[in-house]
């Protein structure tokens, strides 16, 4: 088959995130299964307009703020006559509304909807644009099949009016050869908490920093390692300074996967206080490294955590509960190890091979369906 994927970024983009990892891990495997995959994505300074990355043909057009406006024009001018069997549209950030511009079969791939959370992340005008664009999804994509990464995302689409028959849940995977416990579990530190992810408002990393003040009143040696980049870093560093936490909180910036695994293997706990996620991929990565997680009880994170079995869920915005659970688990090693064992066992279920196989099954089903 020839498959066209439309996504905002490719894996080499400086701002590549979870959606790009999902695409790359899934579709490089689909290429190895004998299929041709073309990615249409946005440009960035220094990027070539065309190149091959791990067997995927990458075509770049438009820029960060213009890509969704460029896609329909570029598709009709350069790609409409190509013999693609299906288009996979990644509904990440702003939909491209490709069903309005082509009659080819479309698989809509959805990680999560921003909903009202987008108003915390950007200015009111752009937030309104994103919010209204998401409200149009049920009408524009009413004849499309959807692949979503969590049950929460599926349920949200159903509440918006789509049929459950249109939606397939396929969880993200992890590289189980890389994400695994250290050979010497006793080498784990006793009070190292780690956060990994983008430094964006909706991630609520400030809640975790404020919780650390309370944690250190009980556990003075507790430290926080923040892995990731984003536009909130300067504000978060200023918050650490105002809370006298500059010595206790370390910002790593971007790190390689290997370095991230090394930190997770040493960490006592991981914490994710987000407003919302598509799927808690970082939860599963931490679990695979034998690191229990405390996270907010919100879509995506509640799908990745079995509360009280593989991790702990707390109410959104409850910094006291966050601090309380971090303190409790730091002090209760048997409970921490119970959660770690359960989480590590469950993490083995989530592999990119399985994600790719199930995605390919959905694509083949759509392509083989009668017109």
PLM region descriptions:
Residues 125-147:
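Membrane-proximal helix-turn-helix segments that form the acceptor-binding/catalytic region
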Residues 152, 173:
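Carbohydrate-associated surface elements
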Residues 321, 328, 335-349, 358-361:
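A short, well-ordered alpha-helix in the C-terminal region of glycosyltransferases
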């Amino acid at each position: 088959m020839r498959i066209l994927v439309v996504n905002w970024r490719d894996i080499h983009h400086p701002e590549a995130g979870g959606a790009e990892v999902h695409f790359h891990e899934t579709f490089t495997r689909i290429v190895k299964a004998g299929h041709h995959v073309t990615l249409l994505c946005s440009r960035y300074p220094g990027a070539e307009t065309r190149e091959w990355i791990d067997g995927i043909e990458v075509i770049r057009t438009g820029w960060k703020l213009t890509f969704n406006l460029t896609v329909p024009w570029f598709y009709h001018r350069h790609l409409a006559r190509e013999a693609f069997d299906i288009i996979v549209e990644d509904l990440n950030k702003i939909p491209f509304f490709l069903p309005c511009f082509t009659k080819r079969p479309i698989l809509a791939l959805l990680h999560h909807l921003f909903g009202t959370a987008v108003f915390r992340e950007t200015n009111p005008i752009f937030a309104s644009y994103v919010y209204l664009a998401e409200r149009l999804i049920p009408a524009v994509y009413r004849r499309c099949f959807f692949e979503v990464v969590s049950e929460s995302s599926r349920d949200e689409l159903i509440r918006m009016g789509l049929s459950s028959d249109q939606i397939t849940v396929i969880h993200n995977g992890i590289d189980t050869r890389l994400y695994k416990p250290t050979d010497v579990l006793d080498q784990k530190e006793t009070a190292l908490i780690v956060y990994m992810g983008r430094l964006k408002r909706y991630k609520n990393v400030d809640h975790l920093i404020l919780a650390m003040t309370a944690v250190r009143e009980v556990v003075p040696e507790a430290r926080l390692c923040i892995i990731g980049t984003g536009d909130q870093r300067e504000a978060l560093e200023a918050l650490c300074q105002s809370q006298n936490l500059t010595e206790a909180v370390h910002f790593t910036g971007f790190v390689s996967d290997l370095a991230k695994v090394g930190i997770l293997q040493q960490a006592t706990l991981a914490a994710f206080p987000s407003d919302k996620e598509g799927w808690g991929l970082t939860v599963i990565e931490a679990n695979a490294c034998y690191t229990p997680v405390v996270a907010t009880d919100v879509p995506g994170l509640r799908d990745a955590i079995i509360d009280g079995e593989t991790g702990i869920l707390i109410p959104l915005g409850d910094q006291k509960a966050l601090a309380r659970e971090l303190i409790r688990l730091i002090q209760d090693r048997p409970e921490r190890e119970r959660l770690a064992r359960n989480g590590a066992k469950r993490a083995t279920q989530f592999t990119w091979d399985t994600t790719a196989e199930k995605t390919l099954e959905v694509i083949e089903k759509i392509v083989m369906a009668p017109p």
